[in-house]
Amino acid sequence: MKHLLALLLAFTLWFNFAPSASADDFANLTPCSENPAYLAKSKNFLNTTNDPNSGKIRAERYASALCGPEGYPHLIVDGRFTHAGDFLIPSILFLYIAGWIGWVGRSYLIEIRESKNPEMQEVVINVPLAIKKMLGGFLWPLAAVGEYTSGKLVMKDSEIPTSPR
């Protein structure tokens, strides 16, 4: 019975019932500056900051994007460098900042591990030490590669405690 269900699952996944996704090279998207639905909506953009022209400025920025028939700008996330500013650059920047925060937190925890009261320093942050770690954390990709190649980044299996359960 197991083999029959496994075969049925393999057959279902191999010949799945969903049609394959296909992008028609943005055939249904038009520049927002030429899209009538977007042009109608852009007249009603609200000012979201103290700047009285913030709605107009935002409409001008979105005008260079591609809009669908409903008049909303669409993100193009297919990896083409012509649309790198839409998704690729912000996502790489997000990953860099998230890695920086993680690396700084890791190095802070490693440093306070040797102090006389590490649990308390996790609760009450040692601000001078944290700032020192934050300022040095911008080169975290190079430091991570250096620690990985030296073997300090990954612990041996024998050094990892396991629960007796």
From Swiss-Prot:
Swiss-Prot/TrEMBL GO biological process terms: photosynthesis
Coiled-coil intervals, chain numbering: none
Signal peptide: 1-23
Chain ranges passing through the membrane: none
Highest taxon, organism lineage: Bacteria
Cellular component GO terms, alphabetical: photosystem I; photosystem I reaction center; plasma membrane
Annotated InterPro entries: PSI_PsaF, PSI_PsaF_sf
This protein's UniProt keywords: Photosynthesis, Photosystem I, Signal
Keyword Signal included in the entry's annotation: yes
Alphabetized SUPFAM superfamilies for the sequence: Subunit III of photosystem I reaction centre, PsaF (SSF81536)
Gene3D superfamilies: Photosystem I PsaF, reaction centre subunit III
Short name of any one Pfam family annotated for the protein: PSI_PsaF
UniProt keyword Signal, yes or no: yes
Protein family per UniProt: Belongs to the PsaF family.
Protein's job: Probably participates in efficiency of electron transfer from plastocyanin to P700 (or cytochrome c553 in algae and cyanobacteria). This plastocyanin-docking protein contributes to the specific association of plastocyanin to PSI.
Protein name: Photosystem I reaction center subunit III
Source lineage: Bacteria, Bacillati, Cyanobacteriota, Cyanophyceae, Synechococcales
